[in-house]
Amino acid sequence: MFNYFRKELDLGGRTLVLETGKIARQADGAVLARLGDTIVLCTAVGAKSAKAGQDFFPLTVNYQEKAFAAGKIPGGFFKREGRPSEHETLVSRLIDRPIRPLFPEGFYNEVQVIATVLSHDMENDPDIVALIGCSAALTLSGIPFFGPVAASRVGLVNGAFVLNPTLEQRAESKLDLVVAGTAEGVLMVESEAEELSEDQMLAAVEFGHKGFQPVIDAIIALAEHAARDPWTLPEQNPEHVALKQRLNEAGRTLLGNAYQEKVKQLRQEKISAAKKQIIETLGIGGTPEESIAKSMLKDLEADIVRNAILDTGIRIDGRDTRTVRPIIGEVGILPRAHGSALFTRGETQALCVATLGTGQDEQVVDALTGEYRSHFMLHYNFPPYSVGEAGRMGSPGRREIGHGKLAWRAVHPVLPAKDAFPYTLRVVSEITESNGSSSMATVCGSSLALMDAGVPLKRPVAGIAMGLIKEDRAFAVLSDILGDEDHLGDMDFKVAGTEQGVTSLQMDIKITSITTEIMRIALQQARDGRMHILGEMAKAITGARGSVAATAPRITVINVPKEKIREVIGTGGKVIREIVEFSGAKIDIEDDGTIKIASTSEESTQKAIDRIQGIVAEPEVGKIYNGKVVKTADFGAFVNFLGSRDGLVHISELQQGRVNKTSDVINVGDVVKVKVLGFDDRGKVKLSMRLVDQTTGEDISDKVGPKGGRGGRGEGDLAE
């Protein structure tokens, strides 16, 4: 019944298994990928024909994690998986990026790739398994695909690279790098690092590329037994070949002249006018050929721009290949924000705002591996006005989530330790203008905003986007690329870091692969650009401000014995709620006895501290405390002191001399001063008012005689 095939190989000391022919047999390609007990079902399906008028490749990649994979039931009212989480979106992009360049040019059939996590062993991350499985599914499907690709994760533990580290090893690693590519070269890199050198980053990429070579061999071996017949691509229409030639003759000069304009919006207007004139000149307006011609004009644009750069070394806006656009950094531009910055680089601009919060503001993430809390968030927004358009507004899309995470990875390694700076941090980046490299503008602006907010970063962080123009005859690496250079080029290579080293690196290749030599040149050129940008940023602010903004909460940390936590919280949280209501401060209590008190008012903070210390402090014999009478009886009065602690003032200790009734001296609600005499055999506190001057709070033990009894006078009054 099943036409089943299986391939096993060793991957970093663990067994990777690829199976096909048993599950999802109606998909064009289906592979069950397994590493340890982590299992991902990967499928690929393609439409047999393109939609009429389609002029782009509609590839969709969906990565989804099922709660049952970790033995869980989803939360929420409906108790089923809902919209993709941020993590699922990021992994979907991780799979999409290395496979997209490997479909043939002009292939416009819809293709859908789905990766479903069926089992998670809490040791092997499913993302690499999913990417490998999706590559295998496409290779088996018969869909035109110039693969296979494979991927590996590289860690750096105790100074040595580790291939596909476990979740436990990743927690100790100074590097989290994912590299994907073909047997010949690298297609995609994504990483977070603790200020590593460019040489270390390049060595990690090479280590990862070498590490996944057996996976490519295994996919090819599996395809030899189980691949479907390859699809037959339609031959190029001779009429289209002729149309392309006519467009080249009629449009090369017009488009070339339009690209001489240095200002983005004016250039776009001239390009649009040139295209319209070309269509009119050829007399194909309103015909089926018009849509085909518009698609071909994109290729002509790319050819004009790319060859101009290779021939002259001069780019669209007049720069050479290494020059960074003019930079202006400003901080403190929003008066009520905790920290703010406006970072402008040419025609790209980011308004970044930092907000400081408490532990109650941490993001709670319910992941397959368990619930955890994140105290640093970075949100990237790309409104349509940033490119002069009217468009959709709503929840963030995949691109915004991906760019935000890239900037997060760049800044995260330089944040202070949580115990040294116990704030929850949120940075929002509003892209107010865009002409390329907005994610790297976010990195720079976020660094400035955090320093403006008083966050003691280890060092400022800057980012730069590199591009590549590569033809058989030559190549050029471009620093600080424009939007058009990103669109028409062969590489988007983003590097962020400090003056000490790289904190994040992301590379996407639009051609089949690039060489180590090109990567080395790009990394060195990026370092030069990064140093220049850091110098420009230093003109705005060189380090964190000495204190947080007046509008930000001040967090004071105190520690109490672990066994006292229950007393501070109270039954059902009653005591802590009363303290919060009384003081107006926010209070976070951790299991180890650390208590964080946050308020914009010092008075509010001190009120909370006094209450808490009163609860946890132990009464000291001989010490005088302020108290309040909470109950009276024939034999004395109960006084509340040290927060919620009560003690007994015996009637003989109320005052010097004879006392007939307790109420003759004090009543409920009276504020008094008491001295701790000791503890009875049940641990109850014995107090005295008689030995304390109730006006000054002075200890007068040496000035009074023996205590008096009930119904009689004492042996002495105040000593003369």
UniProtKB/Swiss-Prot annotation:
Sequence similarity: Belongs to the polyribonucleotide nucleotidyltransferase family.
CDD domains, alphabetized: KH-I_PNPase (cd02393), RNase_PH_PNPase_1 (cd11363), RNase_PH_PNPase_2 (cd11364), S1_PNPase (cd04472)
Location of the S1 motif domain: 622-690
Span of domain KH: 553-612
Keyword terms: Cytoplasm, Magnesium, Metal-binding, Nucleotidyltransferase, RNA-binding, Transferase
Function field: Involved in mRNA degradation. Catalyzes the phosphorolysis of single-stranded polyribonucleotides processively in the 3'- to 5'-direction.
UniProt cofactor(s): Mg(2+)
Signal peptide positions (record): none
One Gene Ontology term, aspect cellular component: cytosol
Reactions listed under catalytic activity: RNA(n+1) + phosphate = RNA(n) + a ribonucleoside 5'-diphosphate
EC primary class: transferase
Protein's UniProt name: Polyribonucleotide nucleotidyltransferase
UniProt keyword Cytoplasm present: yes
Region (Disordered): 698-720
GO biological process: mRNA catabolic process; RNA processing
Gene: pnp
Positions annotated to bind Mg(2+): 486, 492
Molecular functions (GO terms): 3'-5'-RNA exonuclease activity; magnesium ion binding; polyribonucleotide nucleotidyltransferase activity; RNA binding
Organism encoding this protein: Granulibacter bethesdensis (strain ATCC BAA-1260 / CGDNIH1)
SUPFAM superfamilies named among the record's database cross-references: Eukaryotic type KH-domain (KH-domain type I) (SSF54791), Nucleic acid-binding proteins (SSF50249), Ribonuclease PH domain 2-like (SSF55666), Ribosomal protein S5 domain 2-like (SSF54211)
Compartments (UniProt record): Cytoplasm
Keyword Transferase: yes
Enzyme Commission code: 2.7.7.8
